[in-house]
Amino acid sequence: MEKNSSLWKSLVTEHPLCTTWKQEAEGAIYHLASILFVVGFMGGSGFFGLLYVFSLLGLGFLSSAVWAWVDICAADIFSWNFVLFVICFMQFVHIAYQVHSITFARDFHVLYSSLFKPLGIPLPVFRTIALSSEVVSLEKEHCYAMQGKTSIDRLSVLISGRIRVTVDGEFLHYISPFQFLDSPEWDSLRPTEEGIFQVTLTADTDCRYVSWRRKKLYLLFAQHRYISRLFSVLIGSDIADKLYALNDRVYIGKKHHYDIRLPNYYHMSTPDLSRSPLTEQFRNSRQHCNK
């Protein structure tokens, strides 16, 4: 205790005060290092934010080391700043390698470029999403889901091809690439609930889609709240697009357009809808769906 008090006394009370200050300013290297420190500590989060921080802090420590070696000739100041520069450099190389080593199959690259990259989703986050999914092929006239039979146990995004959506043999709308196949079904259930499809989804052409199992995706949401909010936004937007696409297809009577968002649509539309030519085509394709 006495040693600690004597050390504190020698550092604070017995340390000579600065009676005279240097009139001349430090060299440009010192001020450059200070500027790099200020700008470096303004870095953001995420992998690219860390690259920004460690690159500028490393340059700041390197400038301080040069200043200590050239201007004030202080070996201890030079040593500490150089060690800190090496640490920042190693961190920068490690993070850059992590970012560069992220590779995906072609389908995932297309999905990221078209759906996730425009939203500013970093590659490491997308890698976490992709690791929980699988790429599946669906041949023409085969079914992804059948009305009243297929359970809702996954969530999928179409990568290529086109899916035809029907209910009781009546055509509703198409699903195009980079749209969810089953966003309305997913949104209609709570995590603890189970359900079956109320529509039939048939491949109009050869298709490929990325699919997540329901339980695995909910586990991912529980671990990463950011990913949960991201999917909530994507699914909500996709459902809105499907509603507008379906609204454009609905006609009541002779060329009278009816808005499906009106509350009494369900009771008015079903009896008056005439069967479309696609009904027979859908029935002919049922043999593929039952396999």
UniProtKB/Swiss-Prot annotation:
<comment type="function">
    <text>May play a role in the maintenance of heart function mediated, at least in part, through cAMP-binding. May play a role in the regulation of KCNK2-mediated current amplitude.</text>
</comment>
<dbReference type="GO" id="GO:0042391">
    <property type="term" value="P:regulation of membrane potential"/>
</dbReference>
<dbReference type="InterPro" id="IPR018490">
    <property type="entry name" value="cNMP-bd_dom_sf"/>
</dbReference>
<keyword id="KW-1133">Transmembrane helix</keyword>
<dbReference type="InterPro" id="IPR055272">
    <property type="entry name" value="POPDC1-3_dom"/>
</dbReference>
<dbReference type="Pfam" id="PF04831">
    <property type="entry name" value="POPDC1-3"/>
</dbReference>
<protein>
    <recommendedName>
        <fullName>Popeye domain-containing protein 3</fullName>
    </recommendedName>
</protein>
<dbReference type="InterPro" id="IPR006916">
    <property type="entry name" value="POPDC1-3"/>
</dbReference>
<keyword id="KW-0325">Glycoprotein</keyword>
<feature type="transmembrane region" description="Helical">
    <location>
        <begin position="77"/>
        <end position="99"/>
    </location>
</feature>
<dbReference type="GO" id="GO:0016020">
    <property type="term" value="C:membrane"/>
</dbReference>
<feature type="glycosylation site" description="N-linked (GlcNAc...) asparagine">
    <location>
        <position position="4"/>
    </location>
</feature>
<comment type="similarity">
    <text>Belongs to the popeye family.</text>
</comment>
<keyword id="KW-0812">Transmembrane</keyword>
<keyword id="KW-0116">cAMP-binding</keyword>
<feature type="transmembrane region" description="Helical">
    <location>
        <begin position="48"/>
        <end position="70"/>
    </location>
</feature>
<feature type="transmembrane region" description="Helical">
    <location>
        <begin position="27"/>
        <end position="44"/>
    </location>
</feature>
<keyword id="KW-0547">Nucleotide-binding</keyword>
<dbReference type="GO" id="GO:0030552">
    <property type="term" value="F:cAMP binding"/>
</dbReference>
<keyword id="KW-0472">Membrane</keyword>
<keyword id="KW-0114">cAMP</keyword>
